[in-house]
Amino acid sequence: MSDDIPLIDLAPLRDGLDGARQIASALNHALENVGFLIIVNHGVPADLIAQTFEEARRFHDQPLDVKHALRMNEHNNGYMAEGRYNVRTSRVSEKSVQPDANEAFFLKRERPADNPLVLAERRFAGPNIWPTRLPAFREKVIEYCDVVDAMARRLLPALALSLDLEPDYFEQFFAESQYSFRLSHYPPVARKEGLYGIAPHTDMNFMTFLPQSDVPGLQIATEPGKWRDVPYVANSFVVNTGDTLHR
């Protein structure tokens, strides 16, 4: 345990299904009793995580007019300025919440122009918007996304086993899967009621993988109304279940 947030070592997954069975029970406890976990030995290189954080800094260090030129498109890809979003519909949100004090750059799975979903103009499968003034930004971010996506897929058999399902159960739902990757910047703000970097919320997706930094601020609710700080664990990811898996 790490301050009551389960800490799970994914090293056994290197042994395939035998390893998945080793961590299934711990995964079941984490997801059914807490809803969050911290994973280590996940296979995502520490230097790749550090480089991706640096790419996020490079992006947000650009002048505001440059970022506005990359504003979000109809697929929710691109730049979202600070104060343009707040949470009002989540079951854990607050009535007095103000617009989030963060800016962010969003992207989704990179697909070629001849991809069937792109040709069909499927919502959220459309083009990403890439900055042109940041050499190697696109390549490094895609590399990171590919590695994290592969890590998440390695976790699926253990997740299925933790729910007493066949180990390949979730594969059918991820044959043509989607993800959303967010590079956020949280500027310093004054303490004020209803003002958050990002307001209390639940994620609508299947699972979220958040690489930890040594800057505090992230809190989770393990029980209704009971919030706690997430402890920093070097070279780890915080994982939370989304509304899709919850259902």
Give the location of each predicted region.
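Peripheral, non-catalytic segments flanking oxidoreductase cores
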Residues: 1-247
